[in-house]
Amino acid sequence: MQRPDMSVAVAGIKMRNPVMTASGTFGYGAEFADYLDLESIGAMISKGLSLKPKAGNPTPRIVETPGGMLNAIGLQNVGIDAFIEQKLPYLKNVNTPVIVNLYGNTLEEYGEVAARLDGLAGVAGIEVNISCPNVKQGGIVFGTDPGAAQEVVRLVKKNTSKPMIVKLSPNVTDVVVMAKACADAGADALSLINTLTGMAIDLERRRPVLANVTGGLSGPAIKPVALRMVWQVGKAVKLPLIGIGGIMNGRDALEFMLAGATAVQVGTASFLDPSAAQRIAREMEQYLADHNIESVSSLIGALEL
């Protein structure tokens, strides 16, 4: 048998395999070049970028938990202008699609960051993080309010012709409602899930471990929740889905594809093993070869009930 066909496409972004790196776990890409071949993975996603540089939250802001970790980094980043000037030139020379994750604390901020990216060579697409508080609306998170999420998606769509992936929060009553809202507003693809809100407590000090008190839970602990949400959304909307949440090996990734994902993102695994994304792509291909499966795309949504 020939080598399995590992290629997939998400919203017109063609990838050599379904493995993408999750925003905030892979720096700006160059930081991982010593640990894996950047041209062995499907796509790279940048840290979340805002209009202006952001320092993030005070420390401690990461803590290990059973089956995962909590982070309260606070979306620290260099800002969109510094990314374009200092980070993007390196990435343009890597033959792997670069997707820029962006966020804002106001509707206008989302629109402005998207506009800066429009027409930029070297940016294959954008991923919109809607898990941010709307400072003009009392801090309600965009991604928990269907109306607010739609406003963001519509404005970003208006300001850029790049393919747009919208990253969904799991911290909602019904993820399908949010998925449909984003799809109706013009999203080209959906990625899910972002982190679940959690906290850790230091019993001896009787204080929260994180300076921010709460943080985002990621890692294997959230995988069953993520799989369920991908499956639910896949039945409800006709957009390509990217599965995220606790993917540590090739089998995990393929489970997300059976649930309905076209591609996956590897995040927390990269902290434990900086070459995780490349290894997972290799493990997926090996599974297909071992089971005489010709194409990875044949597994998308192939869950049998």
UniProtKB/Swiss-Prot annotation:
Tell me, which GO biological process terms does this entry list? 'de novo' pyrimidine nucleobase biosynthetic process; 'de novo' UMP biosynthetic process
SUPFAM superfamilies in the record, alphabetically? Answer: FMN-linked oxidoreductases (SSF51395)
Gene Ontology MF term list? dihydroorotate dehydrogenase (NAD+) activity
User: Which residues does the annotation say bind FMN?
Assistant: 23, 47-48, 101, 129, 167, 193, 219, 245-246, 267-268
Cellular localisation: Cytoplasm
Cross-referenced Pfam families: DHO_dh
Binding positions (substrate): 47, 71-75, 129, 194-195
The annotation note on the cofactor reads: Binds 1 FMN per subunit.
Q: Which cofactor does it need?
A: FMN
List its EC numbers: 1.3.1.14
Q: What is its main location?
A: cytoplasm
Q: Which UniProt keywords apply?
A: Cytoplasm, Flavoprotein, FMN, NAD, Oxidoreductase, Pyrimidine biosynthesis
Give the pathway. Answer: Pyrimidine metabolism; UMP biosynthesis via de novo pathway; orotate from (S)-dihydroorotate (NAD(+) route): step 1/1
Its recorded reaction(s) are: (S)-dihydroorotate + NAD(+) = orotate + NADH + H(+)
Q: Which residues of this protein are catalytic?
A: 132
One GO term of the cellular component aspect?
cytoplasm
**Subunit architecture:** Heterotetramer of 2 PyrK and 2 PyrD type B subunits.
Family designation:
Belongs to the dihydroorotate dehydrogenase family. Type 1 subfamily.
Q: What does this protein do?
A: Catalyzes the conversion of dihydroorotate to orotate with NAD(+) as electron acceptor.
**Protein's UniProt name:** Dihydroorotate dehydrogenase B (NAD(+)), catalytic subunit
